[in-house]
């Protein structure tokens, strides 16, 4: 009887390091493993406990389909990836992709290296304006194209707005006018929510045993987002930061003057 695989939790940024230490990639499981016991150099990536497929309090009916879902500027860097350790993010990402059958939950597409299409985990939030609490309610698996639509402000910054708009129309069946109305309404909601300072509720993660770290203070989040985007454009990642799905990092005045898209 074959021995059970010694699985590893290897963050994407550390894959080359793990490979050099002897880790091997299982393409079927889409996961790294130790080819034999006793490989001390791989212990740092020893797999933790699996994350439950349904997180505590998660509502998998929330936010179905594809739509523009802009995170208020006062909430930048409250995304899950910025609030958990890279290894925990790998565990969460693997669970989200696995329960979705390695398919985008908005359009049904799978990963395609040739098309530069990957699967990504995205947060669905609820906003209690009376209490000013932003609560994580769901993690959803999206392909690169659908994720770009979701973070339409970042698509504008990166010069991909027309591409994102076309994908939104293709997946949802919206007309050009309908897509423009949808995008404009999303930015109107974004502007209203960005006027408030939100308290973050990540109980869905902490109740599952995931350790979270506090995001930057609300007053510092826009500057931190710009720093991360500048680093990304320069081909590097700011220490401890992943560029958020930031809305209007450099074009806030432009977005307030005209209809997006």
Identify the residue ranges that each predicted region occupies.
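Short, conserved charged micro-motifs
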Residues: 15-17, 39-44, 133-134
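Sequence/structural segment immediately N-terminal to covalent heme-attachment motifs in c-type
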Residues: 95-100
């Amino acid at each position: 009887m074959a021995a059970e695989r010694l699985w590893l939790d290897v963050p994407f940024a550390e894959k080359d390091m793990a490979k050099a230490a002897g880790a091997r990639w299982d393409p079927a499981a889409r996961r790294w493993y130790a080819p034999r016991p006793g490989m001390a150099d791989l212990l740092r990536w020893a797999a933790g406990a699996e994350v439950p497929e349904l997180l505590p309090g998660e509502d998998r009916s929330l936010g179905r389909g594809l739509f523009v879902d802009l995170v208020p500027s006062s909430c930048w860097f409250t995304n899950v990836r910025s609030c958990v350790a890279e290894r925990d993010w790998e565990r969460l990402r693997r669970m989200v992709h696995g329960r979705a059958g390695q398919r985008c939950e908005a359009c049904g597409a799978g990963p395609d290296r040739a098309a530069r299409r990957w699967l990504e985990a995205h947060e669905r939030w609820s906003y209690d304006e009376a209490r000013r609490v932003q609560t994580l309610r769901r993690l959803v698996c999206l392909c690169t194209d659908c994720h770009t639509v979701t973070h339409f402000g970042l698509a504008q910054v990166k010069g991909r707005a027309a591409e994102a708009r076309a994908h939104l129309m293709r997946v949802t069946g919206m007309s050009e006018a309908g897509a423009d109305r949808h995008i404009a309404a999303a930015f109107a909601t974004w502007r209203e929510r960005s006027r408030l300072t939100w308290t973050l509720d990540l109980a869905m993660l902490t109740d599952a045993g995931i350790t979270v770290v506090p995001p930057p203070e609300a007053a510092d989040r826009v500057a931190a987002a710009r720093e991360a985007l500048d680093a990304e454009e320069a081909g590097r990642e700011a220490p401890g930061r992943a560029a958020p799905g930031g809305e209007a990092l450099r074009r806030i005045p432009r977005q307030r003057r005209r209809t997006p898209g």
